[in-house]
Amino acid sequence: LKPKFYLSLHASTMAPIMAGKSKAKNSNPDGEMTFLQHLEELRWHIIRSLVAIVIGAIVAFMFKDIIFDHIILAPNNPDFITNRLLCRLADMVNVPLLCINQNPVELISIKLTGQFTTHITISLVAGLILAFPYVFREFWSFFRPALYEKERKYARGAVTMASLLFLAGIIFGYFIIAPLSINFLGTYRVSDLVTNQINITSYIGSVTSVALASGITFELPIVVFFLARIGVLTPEFMRKYRRHAIVVVLVVAAVITPPDVFSLILVSIPLLILYEVSIFLAARVVRQREA
């Protein structure tokens, strides 16, 4: 059963690609590109994507002060907008635990090359974020011929939607999850005898990984859309495991947030809404496919 399914899926995916690029150079007499020609085309998509990321990284590298002082290190500052708003909310509802990051985490660099390599790493991450719409467009233009005309119609705007969702995820991770994570991890103590002195690479790794992970997580509706199109995922399956998804979201939110219900809700609700939107998209795709 498994080999048959794989062969069927492989054939249904690759056949349109092989037929959809017949105008390329060096095509065979039947008007279809060979496997090696497809690899060559994919190679150029990857090269152009890498060039775009490098250009974005160079731009980010030149704006070091803005990138670090006003973006990367900002969530650790009491004046960061999220920290200020949560402190105001803490006063309004009389929940002091909501007021976070009032004592900034002390950051140190323990290697001679630490700050320079950190600068390069952050520049590359920023380059990836800046170039994401173009990178997604490059890979989308490679896989788009695998879709039938009707499927292309339904997939219009995929690049724009994926870019907006990724940006929304980055914003959510940076403004919501990152400050809460810094507060939790930076103040956590196994013993009063241990003092936290956080390495700058550890801090930046946490902030960037949280932001990127949120950006990727927000791509869930796009992933569900295409999995539903090829019949791998159904809305019934997602509804069946809805409770499991809720438990996972609540557990993750409880770990990274302060021990109060407001922070838990603040992190959980957007992720649960994202899951419900994905179910709606999967159901819509199934209805369109059966129509």
Model-predicted segments: where are they?
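Membrane topogenic/interface segments and analogous intrinsically disordered interaction regions
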Residues: 5-291
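Low-complexity, intrinsically disordered Ser/Thr/Pro- and acidic-rich segments
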Residues: 1-3
